[in-house]
């Protein structure tokens, strides 16, 4: 702990969630692609929903179809992402040990099972997620309205 404190980093342990993580003002990770951000938000919601039901396990299993379906419910995905984009996103989230695919990534489909680890709690709080999902929806609506307005302006009289 003292080693990290010299650099302004705090080592945190949450026994209840079963995670150890570092925190500090100087810590900035890489910028996540849009799909990774959407998946992260949706995975957190799925995790919270499934943990509300009496579960003795600390991790949750879901499918890629459920993740894409939930993203569709919140209108944050206009269409199904490409297989390549989904593979990259799953690999990125696996790199940070947020999820673990139970099936081979080369055979990616809607039935592909994903384990969501408890460390998803350290990424965002539930209320933050709902705000971000609303922001994604507003951005899409503004984009759609701008496209409609642009189309209307381009129409001959």
For each of these PLM feature ranges, what is it?
Residues 5-13, 90, 94-106:
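A short, conserved structural fragment
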Residues 33-58:
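Positively charged, polyanion-binding regions of nucleic-acid-associated proteins
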Residues 19-24, 100-127:
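Accessory beta->alpha helical hairpin/"wing" motif in late/C-terminal subdomains of nucleic-acid enzymes
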Residues 54-72:
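Short acidic, hydrophobic short linear motifs in intrinsically disordered regions
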Residues 1, 78-95:
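Short amphipathic alpha-helical interaction segments
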Residues 155-157:
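Long, compositionally biased intrinsically disordered regions
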Residues 115-152:
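Short, amphipathic alpha-helical interaction segments positioned at domain boundaries
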Residues 1-26:
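Eukaryotic partner-binding/assembly regions in large regulatory complexes
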